[in-house]
């Protein structure tokens, strides 16, 4: 794996005007926000896992046919503590932070004691989500940080959500210490309050509980990164990749990162929980299959009395192991890549990840989805458009380039599902080739423009487009 993934990124706090080739559609006005890890060492200390790096927020702003780029590190509590100490002092997924060497034995003992049940980081590296009119950096932790989508400034601390046609946001979390027992919690955040006074109240203060689902295994909550939603149902996959709570409570004392507290049981089952969006009631029928690992689902919809749920799955959890930095530094040709499990479309010799759709079709029957094709040996990354009807795909690639998650933006008044553009941030292995924002015609997957920026751009994970 190339060093461009795990080298320290740099901020570009002021907007940089991009050099254009091709023509940006005149209707494309707004900002593409991106999020991902961008700082992998602080002082003399370094992180162990790619998902540990400090969050770096990026934006590409489209205005009157021009494109402007800027980036800033998320000023989370974790970032502030680490930079103030000039070392890693907050534990992350794959990196355990220890007491300062200068502390005496009593201070160290107290630190171990208070970390028995760890207060997790607020380093939100995964995504950008919208609650009402507010935008937040988020990840698989209990805290989120609000950001200003224009300046990228961090407003303050307050995972893959869904939005319905009314603009409401749906998300889920866990309540491990609930009085009625540990459970998964699904909630809704209304879009905009109707009253003048209510409209100034942050959307998160109006959160509505939809339902709670008890853990299948009391001391082993399932890992989840996304869930599905149709017109009438929410679908949650309780998979066999689980967090060992007992091991977690002793992890700090034993010197184990919480990433090592995840365990996969190939002999376990995978449960599908189907919840009525209106009533919050969980379907009485139990749906289950063999064990697998899932990070992203593509889409879900209802057809002929059935719920169709399209997933990207793996036979084990080795995908996470692949992103330990010691593994990323290995030669790509010798790396034992994760095997892909079930796939919707045959013919792929590489993994397909970071799927996206025309969000107008979220929860509805759809035809196309877009994703990143990852092939570690040789390292040729591509983005692809998949036709689920014909079971064919078309792709874009360029030598020495790594495109990020493709984001679909629909044309104004679009009728066809694929009438719009695809946006992808692209970095290169070649230091002489500047990073650029790629704009593709979503129908043909042909390049119509690129916006090259003469500054450092880092690889990211997820994001969204804000129309203006």
List PLM regions with ranges:
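Beta-propeller domains
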Residues: 1-468
């Amino acid at each position: 794996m190339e060093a461009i993934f795990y080298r320290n990124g740099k901020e570009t706090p002021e907007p940089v005007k991009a050099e254009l080739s091709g023509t940006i559609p005149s209707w494309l006005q707004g900002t593409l926000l991106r999020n991902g890890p961008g700082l992998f060492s602080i002082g003399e200390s370094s992180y162990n896992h790619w998902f540990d790096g400090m969050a770096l927020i990026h934006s590409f702003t489209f205005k009157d046919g021009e494109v402007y780029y800027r980036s800033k590190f998320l000023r989370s509590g974790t970032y502030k503590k680490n930079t103030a100490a000039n070392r890693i002092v907050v534990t992350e997924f794959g990196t355990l932070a220890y007491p300062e060497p200068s502390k005496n034995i009593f201070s160290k003992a107290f630190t171990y004691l208070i970390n028995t049940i760890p207060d997790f980081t607020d380093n939100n590296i995964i995504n950008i989500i919208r609650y009402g009119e507010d935008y937040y950096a988020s990840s698989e932790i209990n805290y989120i940080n609000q950001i200003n989508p224009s300046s990228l400034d961090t407003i303050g601390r307050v995972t893959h959500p869904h939005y319905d046609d009314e603009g409401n946001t749906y998300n889920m979390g866990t309540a491990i210490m609930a009085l009625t027992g540990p459970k998964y919690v699904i909630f809704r955040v209304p879009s905009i309050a109707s009253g003048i006074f209510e409209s100034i109240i942050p959307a998160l203060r109006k959160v509505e509980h939809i339902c709670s689902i008890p853990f299948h295994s009391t001391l082993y909550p399932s890992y989840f990164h996304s869930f599905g939603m149709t017109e009438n149902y929410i679908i949650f996959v309780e998979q066999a990749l689980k967090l060992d709570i007992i091991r977690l409570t002793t992890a700090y004392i034993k010197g184990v990162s919480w990433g090592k507290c995840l365990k996969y049981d190939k002999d376990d089952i995978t449960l599908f929980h189907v919840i009525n969006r209106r009533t919050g009631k969980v379907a009485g029928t139990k749906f289950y299959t063999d064990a697998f690992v899932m990070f992203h689902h593509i889409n879900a919809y209802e057809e002929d009395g059935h719920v169709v749920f399209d997933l990207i799955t793996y036979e084990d959890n080795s995908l996470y192991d692949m992103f330990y930095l010691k593994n990323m530094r290995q030669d790509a040709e010798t790396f034992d890549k994760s095997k892909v499990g079930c796939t919707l479309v045959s013919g792929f010799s590489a993994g397909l990840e970071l799927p996206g759709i025309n969000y107008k079709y979220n929860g509805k029957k759809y035809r196309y989805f877009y994703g990143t094709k990852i092939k570690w040996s040789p390292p040729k990354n591509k983005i692809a458009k998949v036709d689920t009807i014909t079971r064919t795909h078309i792709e874009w690639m360029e030598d020495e380039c790594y495109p990020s998650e493709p984001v679909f933006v629909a044309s104004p008044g679009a009728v066809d599902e694929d009438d719009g553009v695809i946006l992808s941030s692209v970095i290169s292995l070649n230091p002489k080739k500047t990073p650029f924002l790629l704009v593709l015609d979503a129908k043909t997957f042909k390049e119509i423009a690129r916006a090259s920026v003469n500054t450092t751009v880092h690889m990211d994970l997820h994001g969204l487009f804000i129309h203006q």
